[in-house]
UniProtKB/Swiss-Prot annotation:
The lineage of its organism: Bacteria, Pseudomonadati, Pseudomonadota, Gammaproteobacteria, Enterobacterales. This is UDP-N-acetyl-D-mannosamine dehydrogenase. Disruption phenotype: Mutants do not synthesize Und-PP-GlcNAc-ManNAcA (lipid II) and enterobacterial common antigen (ECA). It catalyses: UDP-N-acetyl-alpha-D-mannosamine + 2 NAD(+) + H2O = UDP-N-acetyl-alpha-D-mannosaminouronate + 2 NADH + 3 H(+). GO terms for cellular component: cytosol. SMART domains: UDPG_MGDP_dh_C. Optimum pH is 10.0. NCBIfam families: NDP-sugDHase, PRK11064.1. Catalyzes the four-electron oxidation of UDP-N-acetyl-D-mannosamine (UDP-ManNAc), reducing NAD(+) and releasing UDP-N-acetylmannosaminuronic acid (UDP-ManNAcA). The gene is wecC. Pathway: Bacterial outer membrane biogenesis; enterobacterial common antigen biosynthesis. Homodimer.
Amino acid sequence: MSFATISVIGLGYIGLPTAAAFASRQKQVIGVDINQHAVDTINRGEIHIVEPDLASVVKTAVEGGFLRASTTPVEADAWLIAVPTPFKGDHEPDMTYVESAARSIAPVLKKGALVILESTSPVGSTEKMAEWLAEMRPDLTFPQQVGEQADVNIAYCPERVLPGQVMVELIKNDRVIGGMTPVCSARASELYKIFLEGECVVTNSRTAEMCKLTENSFRDVNIAFANELSLICADQGINVWELIRLANRHPRVNILQPGPGVGGHCIAVDPWFIVAQNPQQARLIRTAREVNDHKPFWVIDQVKAAVADCLAATDKRASELKIACFGLAFKPNIDDLRESPAMEIAELIAQWHSGETLVVEPNIHQLPKKLTGLCTLAQLDEALATADVLVMLVDHSQFKVINGDNVHQQYVVDAKGVWR
């Protein structure tokens, strides 16, 4: 069965680029999202997120009649579910959005359809999704019931793209294809080859699920080493960035760069999925998460120390001091604030500091709700000219071009080493 019509559930940072990639190959693509604003924006040929090169692809696809968005699912040959999978309680995975998406498409599933889960999920989620679909559609058969002879094929195919490079990596990167059966994997591979230039690497659904969690946990553990090293160096009076540069001259050493913490909806979340399912075995993974989660509070302590030094050296009161936070996004040159340690730090500073807290974030036009009324969104020049204490949190390109020698403030907390 060919894939004449493809539907993507969830039109966020992964779903919309994926929908656009299929539409760019002149496939009929229906994007589904519960966010009416996102749907309306896309149907105008515009985008509601920041991602290089995405706007032009969406505009061309919509104008050509290959991409449209809706708030309700309609019949399609293939479905891709790319909805959030946050955690709840004690870092337990919350599969509510995946279940809701699966149950929303069940009424319009047809024999021969392919359903792919892309959302980062704990091991066994694809099988659980298949159970939800089977529960709602007893008239159809699924892989867990009849194997290769199933009416509906099910697979897990995680994305592995870098925000800011999504439109390139979506097409160029290899793709892990985890079907519930070999037939499911073959059909999923056929679907992705519509736009994929990388290789489709086939495995089973459980291994594919664990693969995505492993990739991000590996990154988290390595970042935790760098962040822990930064704490040690601060106590020892050593420039951690110089230290890492020197250590990395060793041919078999590649230490990552420290920062204010770890953010985003992948690296800051996925390791907990492994810990939740394997609490006794995942001790290193848990410790790395705790190290990275603690880093924002260490940054806050540095800010408090800088403010105390500033007050001691000037005749200003605390309420007269301005603190400027540079960056809110979880990584450079994007507008994604999910799980961002920079935003957490800005919020904590604003709650603690009696004076004005400025925020400079060149990729947004208004503050998120949790910072509205707490902080002031400022331009870069204004913050540099008026703030008493500077806090560098995200190494956006606009910040990196500023020569540290031209920063006149004596009280600087640089969590990214931009002005080192």
